[in-house]
């Protein structure tokens, strides 16, 4: 996992596909876009613009992805995201790996939380369990941008 703020320069060189995704986040006015999917580089890099209300962590299920990495960016609002390394000991709640490239767990072993504010981003790789959309202080309306980068696009 990589955690940062879009206003800060990248501390090191990242794969070109991730740099392209971060450049898109820096250059886009998300207030001007409706929720939905925007392709950046076909199915190699695309984004989901999502408006939601944060919920208690116990209501949200931890998740992992196997074919894409997630770059989760907060445009407005505030949220916590649960994070952990996938130890292989988490009980599967629902597997939609073939249909949607997602596995949900009942819970997440050794979970910590990061706090997201507008401009924050977190990059989740296949071994990173994450539980997005959790309340920080109180329920909050947020706009979250999730950029999906195909593992095959990394070089």
UniProtKB/Swiss-Prot annotation:
Organism expressing this protein natively: Escherichia coli (strain K12)
Domain of life from the UniProt record: Bacteria
Pfam families: DUF386 (PF04074)
Classification lineage: Bacteria, Pseudomonadati, Pseudomonadota, Gammaproteobacteria, Enterobacterales
Family: Belongs to the TabA/YiaL family.
GO cellular component, one term: cytosol
Protein name per UniProt: Protein YiaL
Cited Gene3D superfamilies: YhcH/YjgK/YiaL
GO biological process terms, semicolon-separated: response to radiation
InterPro entries, per database record: NanQ/TabA/YiaL, NanQ/TabA/YiaL_sf
């Amino acid at each position: 996992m990589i955690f940062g703020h879009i206003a800060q320069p990248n501390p090191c060189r990242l794969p070109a596909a991730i740099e392209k995704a971060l450049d898109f986040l820096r250059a886009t006015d998300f207030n001007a876009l409706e929720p939905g999917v925007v392709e950046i580089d076909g199915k190699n890099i695309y984004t989901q613009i999502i408006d939601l209300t944060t919920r208690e962590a116990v209501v949200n299920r931890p998740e992992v992805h196997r074919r894409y990495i997630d770059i989760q960016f907060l445009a407005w609002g505030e949220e916590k995201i649960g994070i952990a390394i996938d130890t292989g000991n988490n009980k599967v709640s629902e597997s939609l790996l073939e249909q949607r490239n997602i596995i949900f767990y009942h819970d997440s072993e050794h979970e910590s939380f990061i706090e997201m504010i507008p401009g924050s981003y977190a990059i989740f790789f296949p071994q990173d369990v994450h539980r997005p959309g959790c309340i920080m202080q109180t329920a909050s309306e947020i706009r979250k941008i999730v950029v999906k980068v195909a593992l095959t696009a990394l070089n």
